[in-house]
Amino acid sequence: SRNDTIESITIPYPLIIRPINSTKGEKEDIHICHTPGELRQSLNEQSHCENFILQEFVEKEYELDCIGVMTDQGMILPGAVLKHRHWPPLIGAGAYGLFTPVDDQNINFQGLETFLKQSGYHGPFSVEFLHKGDKNYFMEVNFRNEGLAYAATVAGANLHARYVDPSVKIDKVKPTYMMNYSLDFLYVKNGDLPLRTWLRDFLRTRCCINFSLRDPKPLAAHYYHKLFRRK
């Protein structure tokens, strides 16, 4: 908690601090701290979050966001988003990545299913890992619908339909690039990514997290309210 003494912490620096309960914190509550002074500064920042988890910071090669659903018939885990870019960088939401079949990612499938069965949870979920070398380092399980779950649908695995209708078949999924363009374009705006590189990635994207050509009205309504109904 904020009142604990940082001198008693035995985790080696650098470390990462994040809300222990994601529903009671924000992305802004996640910090990478290299010294006790930076940790104290992070804990002193104004926030609604009071309790945090501290972990050794792993210099990851990339993050994996495994997307699945737990049903009466067992766990269905078709694939994972290999995140190439986040916003804010390193610690933020997935902005651009590749949804790949789970068989390609060396995930402990049986261990994960056992964990979910023991938890008693049924419904959509996601599991996040850090990847470095030949290892996947467990981060967290989210017992909720994942923001990137639409990538699984576009790749051929409609998990929500399968959850409500066991007769829905999920065949082998295909690798699919996904992008949250409104976040990812900030890399270009900030000068961290050339426009030509971003356009290349955008053109090979088949899953825009916040836009669908088959259903454009939600996006149009979003920008209409943003532009013309400001208070």
What are these regions (language model features)?
Residues 9-12, 132-137:
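A short, glycine/Asx- and small/polar-enriched loop/turn
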Residues 37, 56-120, 142-167:
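ATP-dependent carboxylate/phosphate-activation module, predominantly the ATP-grasp catalytic core
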Residues 122-133:
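A short glycine-rich, hydrophobically flanked beta-strand micro-motif that places a catalytic Asp/Glu
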Residues 15, 76, 137-140:
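Protein kinase-like catalytic core scaffold
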Residues 165-231:
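Peripheral (often C-terminal) accessory segments that flank ATP-dependent C-N-forming ligase machineries
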Residues 129, 140-143:
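Active-site proximal loops enriched in glycine and acidic residues that flank catalytic Cys/His/Asp
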Residues 49-50, 118-122:
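Short secondary-structure junctions
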Residues 1-53, 58-59, 70-74, 105-109:
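Active-site nucleotide/adenylate-binding loops and adjacent lid/helix of ATP-dependent enzymes
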